[in-house]
Amino acid sequence: MHDANIRVAIAGAGGRMGRQLIQAALALEGVQLGAALEREGSSLLGSDAGELAGAGKTGVTVQSSLDAIKDDFDVFIDFTRPEGTLNHLAFCRQHGKGMVIGTTGFDEAGKQAIRDAAADIAIVFAANFSVGVNVMLKLLEKAAKVMGDYTDIEIIEAHHRHKVDAPSGTALAMGEAIAHALDKDLKDCAVYSREGHTGERVPGTIGFATVRAGDIVGEHTAMFADIGERLEITHKASSRMTFANGAVRSALWLSGKENGLFDMRDVLDLNNL
């Protein structure tokens, strides 16, 4: 990677998240917007990426071909859909480009493809790039070690009506953080739906509840409930810019790293807390 500004490419440049990623890339010192990508046939192809994001003219035009931009970026930032991200991953692996992946909804094969690619390129892969959410994950680990053995643990998340996967990647990351602190595997203790005559709550499980409504950017709560008291740890996002800023910050952090799989805890050095 270059010693000068890190050049980033933004996938899905015309989407809500893509436009904010462009804004964040233009605002962060040490980062340069190198390329912007949209799907073939998009009416936005040829547009100036900065103008598209409401940030003024940049001279970077929106393209549809990875080959056309391969010399214009060092790190590829992708918040699209799993199938598209995996195609971009293969290209970046082939050409030695770093990646920041904020896409959610991968199946196990997709996650394994990311792990495999990290042998050759540097990747930051996180369910949520918000600083606050990642601090919350650390707090959940601490709370679970103290209270997890005797409380009922529930995770409640809410997002806008357009979100296509449930539970959210962040909710799953919360469950994984709690399960890991309790020396459990989430797949063995998660309860994702309750309907009809369910019987009493099974001790040691982690329940999930999902809300999809309106324009909610993202709200997540973990509840540790006992008889007589409960602890709730909540994060609420009011703007996607918090995710965009974290993603671009992650791209800058990848500077000088040749390979490896990282997450926001690495970027923020939370593992040493």
Curated annotation (Swiss-Prot):
Catalysed transformations (reactions): (S)-2,3,4,5-tetrahydrodipicolinate + NAD(+) + H2O = (2S,4S)-4-hydroxy-2,3,4,5-tetrahydrodipicolinate + NADH + H(+); (S)-2,3,4,5-tetrahydrodipicolinate + NADP(+) + H2O = (2S,4S)-4-hydroxy-2,3,4,5-tetrahydrodipicolinate + NADPH + H(+)
Record carries keyword ATP-binding: no
Broad EC category: oxidoreductase
GO CC terms in record: cytosol
InterPro entries: DapB_C (IPR022663), DapB_N (IPR000846), DapB_N_CS (IPR022664), DHDPR_bac (IPR023940), NAD(P)-bd_dom_sf (IPR036291)
Pathway membership, UniProt: Amino-acid biosynthesis; L-lysine biosynthesis via DAP pathway; (S)-tetrahydrodipicolinate from L-aspartate: step 4/4
Main location: cytoplasm
Keywords, comma-separated and alphabetical: Amino-acid biosynthesis, Cytoplasm, Diaminopimelate biosynthesis, Lysine biosynthesis, NAD, NADP, Oxidoreductase
Localization annotation: Cytoplasm
EC identifiers of the protein: 1.17.1.8
CDD domains hit by this protein: DHDPR_N (cd02274)
Residues that coordinate or bind NADP(+): 39
Active site: 159, 163
Binding site for (S)-2,3,4,5-tetrahydrodipicolinate: 160, 169-170
Entry keyword annotation includes DNA-binding: no
GO molecular-function terms, A-Z: 4-hydroxy-tetrahydrodipicolinate reductase; NAD binding; NADP binding; oxidoreductase activity, acting on CH or CH2 groups, NAD or NADP as acceptor
GO BP: any one term: lysine biosynthetic process via diaminopimelate
Binding-site list for NAD(+): 12-17, 38, 102-104, 126-129
Assembly and binders: Homotetramer.
Family note: Belongs to the DapB family.
Protein purpose: Catalyzes the conversion of 4-hydroxy-tetrahydrodipicolinate (HTPA) to tetrahydrodipicolinate.
Protein name: 4-hydroxy-tetrahydrodipicolinate reductase
Organism: Escherichia coli O157:H7
Gene assigned in the entry: dapB
